[in-house]
């Protein structure tokens, strides 16, 4: 019997404020509700979902370094535009990943248009709100479980 597939969900700075922080950009869902919905979806697919949210770059890096996950879904938040260190951590562990953003970063301030992750990601989802996380999760599960027999 093969081991259960595992996905690491990484959420960067200020995402702990979802539901009350700039709902025009980020929506009204809390991070807890997004994560719980993802865990329900993962459990239904017999996939384990591990989650970390931190405002501290080194904690995200440590979680990436220590994971035994088969796939990563990451919303680096503000670290998207600044963190070569998190990029290097993901590349260092050689785990495929999908980059997710709640808002459409390309329709916002110019400094948000650049990502240190997008060129290495399997895919990028932005601007679809909380649904983007579900789309990323379903894609990751499909990749891990392969085509149906």
Swiss-Prot record:
Gene name of the encoded protein: aroQ
InterPro entries noted in UniProt: DHquinase_II, DHquinase_II_CS, DHquinase_II_sf
Record key words, sorted: Amino-acid biosynthesis, Aromatic amino acid biosynthesis, Lyase
Biological role: Catalyzes a trans-dehydration via an enolate intermediate.
Record EC number: 4.2.1.10
Protein origin, superkingdom: Bacteria
Database matches in SUPFAM superfamilies: Type II 3-dehydroquinate dehydratase (SSF52304)
Family to which the UniProt record says this protein belongs: Belongs to the type-II 3-dehydroquinase family.
Site features described as Transition state stabilizer, chain residue numbers: 21
Pathway: Metabolic intermediate biosynthesis; chorismate biosynthesis; chorismate from D-erythrose 4-phosphate and phosphoenolpyruvate: step 3/7
Self-association state and partner proteins as the record states: Homododecamer.
Binding site for substrate: 75, 81, 88, 102-103, 112
Active site: 26, 101
Catalytically driven reaction(s): 3-dehydroquinate = 3-dehydroshikimate + H2O
GO molecular function, one term: 3-dehydroquinate dehydratase activity
UniProt cross-references to CDD domains, sorted A to Z: DHQase_II
GO biological process terms on file: amino acid biosynthetic process; aromatic amino acid family biosynthetic process; chorismate biosynthetic process; quinate catabolic process
Protein name in UniProt: 3-dehydroquinate dehydratase
């Amino acid at each position: 019997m093969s081991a259960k597939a595992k996905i690491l969900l990484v959420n960067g700075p200020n995402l702990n404020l979802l539901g009350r922080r700039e709902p025009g950009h980020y929506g009204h869902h809390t991070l807890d509700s997004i994560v719980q919905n993802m865990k329900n979806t993962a459990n239904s697919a017999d996939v384990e979902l591990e989650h970390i949210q931190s405002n501290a770059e080194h904690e995200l890096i440590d979680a990436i370094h220590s994971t035994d996950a088969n796939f990563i879904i990451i919303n680096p938040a503000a670290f998207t535009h600044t963190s070569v260190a998190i990029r290097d951590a993901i590349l260092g562990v050689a785990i495929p990943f999908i980059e997710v953003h709640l808002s459409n970063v390309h329709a916002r301030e110019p400094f948000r248009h650049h990502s240190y992750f997008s060129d290495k990601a399997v895919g990028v989802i932005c601007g679809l709100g909380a649904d983007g996380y579900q789309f990323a999760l379903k894609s990751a599960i499909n990749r891990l479980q392969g085509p149906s027999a």
